[in-house]
UniProtKB/Swiss-Prot annotation:
It is found in: Cell inner membrane. The gene is cysZ. Keywords: Amino-acid biosynthesis, Cell inner membrane, Cell membrane, Cysteine biosynthesis, Membrane, Sulfate transport, Transmembrane, Transmembrane helix, Transport. Belongs to the CysZ family. This is Sulfate transporter CysZ. Pfam families: EI24.
């Protein structure tokens, strides 16, 4: 169990695994339902459609492989599939998080209160509605930060050779970091921590955050498991917040 006192930060793998346990806590499960439903509808529908299109998309991607790399086509084909899953999964994960942002924030708040014994501000439907403009402004901040970087990486996919070798690795690392930002931001935002300050705080635990984001990214690509990943990641990130940053940044005790 995570405590409210300052503890030695653990690995991102630990916090990701904790997320799967924390979503089942009595009293927390009811706050998991709405984020879970949003994720099931969006990710389930999106990946069903994606798998009906892969037969057409992958040959199109492989057509950009230069002649001098054709001898590696048997290795590049699975890389192309993984690339499509990574990009597609990240974009739809971002969309799902946009829609579920108010409910993810509420889940993070209630879990933090459960883990620490602290008393959160009064919440509920009216509280969520009141906070929606601020929450969506925060989502726009994240989008404005990530979109230019994502566009640069997507352009690399169209460069012969680089697009089939280096670009997928760079995209995976980028999506891992962005997913760490996405999910860790919920408890930070609950305490009105500025976006820039939040990113600086995450950099103090780079390895743990990359591990956490990488696992979240991988599970986003796996059918069935990806339907449950949103509330799991929110809970894991909240546990990390309690251990690593709450003592310094908490607005309510």
């Amino acid at each position: 169990m995570v405590s409210s006192s300052t503890t030695v930060p653990r690995s991102g793998v630990y916090y990701f695994s904790q997320g799967w346990k924390l979503v089942t806590l009595p009293g927390i499960r009811r706050f998991v339902i709405l984020p879970l439903l949003v994720n099931i509808v969006l990710m389930g529908g999106a990946f069903w459609w994606l798998f009906t299109q892969l037969d057409a998309w992958i040959p199109s991607l492989m057509s950009h492989v230069p002649d001098w790399l054709q001898w590696l086509s048997y290795l590049l084909w699975p890389i192309a599939v993984i690339s499509v899953l990574l990009v597609f999964g990240y974009f739809f994960s971002t969309l799902a998080n946009w829609i579920a942002a108010p409910f993810n924030g509420l889940l993070a708040e209630q879990l933090e209160a459960r883990l620490t014994g602290a008393t959160p501000p009064d919440t509920g439907i009216l509280g969520i509605m009141k906070d929606v403009p601020r929450i969506m402004k925060r989502e726009w901040q994240k989008l404005a930060w990530y979109l230019p970087r994502a566009i640069v990486l997507l352009v690399l996919y169209f460069i012969p050779g680089i697009g089939q070798t280096i670009a997928p690795v760079l995209w995976f690392l980028f999506s891992a970091w962005m997913l760490a930002i996405q999910y860790c931001d919920y408890p930070f935002d609950n305490h009105k921590v500025p976006f820039k300050t939040m990113r600086a705080a995450l950099r103090t635990q780079k390895v743990a955050n990359m591990q956490f984001g990488a696992l979240t990214s991988l599970f986003t690509m796996i059918p069935v498991l990806n339907l449950f990943i949103m509330p799991v990641a929110v809970c894991g990130a909240t546990a990390m917040w309690v251990d690593c940053w709450r003592a310094k940044h908490a607005l309510w005790k």
